[in-house]
Amino acid sequence: MPIMLNFSNGRILPESEVEALRNVARSNQSDVLLVGSRSLRLHHISFMDGFSVEPIPGSFLDRIGERRHRRLAESLERQLNGGSSFLQAFSQYIEQTSSAPPLQESVRNEVQSRVNSYAFSVNPGDFPCSVLHLSCPITLCVPETGVFVKNARCSKVCSLYDISALTEMLRRNASHPLSREAFTPGMIVHKEECNFNTTEQHFCILPRSDTRL
């Protein structure tokens, strides 16, 4: 059931309300918030005890006010993360916990170049799956700009990542969040090389593209 929230952009919620929201998110992992006529989705990222908030697209009038809708989500997200955006909190977490051996600069640059080349604007309607399968493993939100990444170096299963979150991981020399391996260029997959398997309910690499990777 959606949570009704009396909140507007620029308003500071009492700490008791902020903590109550955190606790609800910790219990449910994901919740829908109703702020007036606008809907937001709140996610709890348990491995770092962080919170991300994304606007849920609605009517045509909502889309006209998309910028205000996003600012509302960002304002609430900062309050839930103690003043930081989710990406800032994630960056701090990576800095504190990263223990991966440093990638050679040439390899890191090649991975980042491939990320930039393969990134695309995400339109959920283009995929034969629910938005659940389009959620970034880091932010738990559907990215505006995303890129497919293998779940492990030798895996044929892929997940969609938010390009900003992935770029931050590379900048911080963090390991792959699922396999804990160092990132390699071959882990970054072009959109056209991925197919959603409706039987197994995940994205996988098309057989004809194996030789490219």
Curated annotation (Swiss-Prot):
Class of the enzyme per the UniProt entry, highest EC level: transferase
EC number: 2.3.2.27
Single GO BP term: biological process involved in symbiotic interaction
Keywords: Host cytoplasm, Secreted, Transferase, Ubl conjugation pathway, Virulence
InterPro entries given in the database record: Effector_NleG, Effector_NleG_sf
Primary site of residence: secreted
Placement of sequence motif PDZ-binding motif: 211-213
Induction / repression: Transcribed for 2-5 hours after treatment that induces type 3 secretion system expression.
Region entry RING/U-box domain, spans: 136-189
UniProt note: domains: Interacts with PDZ domain of host GOPC via NleG8's C-terminal residues.
Family membership: Belongs to the NleG E3 ligase family.
SUBUNIT field: Interacts with host GOPC (human protein).
Protein name: E3 ubiquitin-protein ligase NleG8
Organism, scientific name: Citrobacter rodentium
